Amino acid sequence: MEYILHVDDSVKCIFCDKKQYVLKETQHAMVMLNLFPYNPGHLMVAPKRHVANLEDLTDEELKEIMELTQKSVKVLKEIANPDGFNIGINIGRVAGAGFEGHIHIHIVPRWNGDTNFMPIIGETKVIPEGIEKTFKKLKPYFE
């Protein structure tokens, strides 16, 4: 909820301005850890070019975004052994996009009994693994 309720106006775009926790870059796309993860291993895949609309992506961008999405699922299956995934795109603030100006795909690993996903009422949750630890665990698999 923090990312929806309190947008940091000093950061124009996390994908363009704040490229920390980037696991891999290709010519047209990148995959990075979400700074406000729903679950450990929550990744985001985005085009490098600042573009808001799905229909404005080039064929090359679409191809590389899907290849990185596929790679991300394979890596997460290997190291985190999730029971499933939520994979999706939030287009527009009303749809939950925290950064609506730069389209991106969320890849969220899920486990059976996972009741800690996107809590709305309490607006808090415990993430069992810190982002630094998750980054260090995932980074070698993307090299």
Name every feature range the model reports, one short phrase each.
Residues H28, P37-Y38, V51, Q70, ...:
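Short, charged/polar surface micro-motifs in flexible loops or helix N-caps
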Residues T58-P82, E132-T134, K139:
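Long, well-ordered alpha-helical scaffolding segments within enzyme catalytic domains
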Residues H42, H50, H102-H106:
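Histidine-centered active-site/metal-ligand motif
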Residues N86, G96-N116:
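Histidine-centered divalent-metal-coordination microenvironment in nucleic-acid enzymes
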Residues M44-M66, I121-I127:
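Short histidine-centered catalytic/ligand-binding loop motif
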Residues A80-R93:
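A short glycine-rich, hydrophobically flanked beta-strand micro-motif that places a catalytic Asp/Glu
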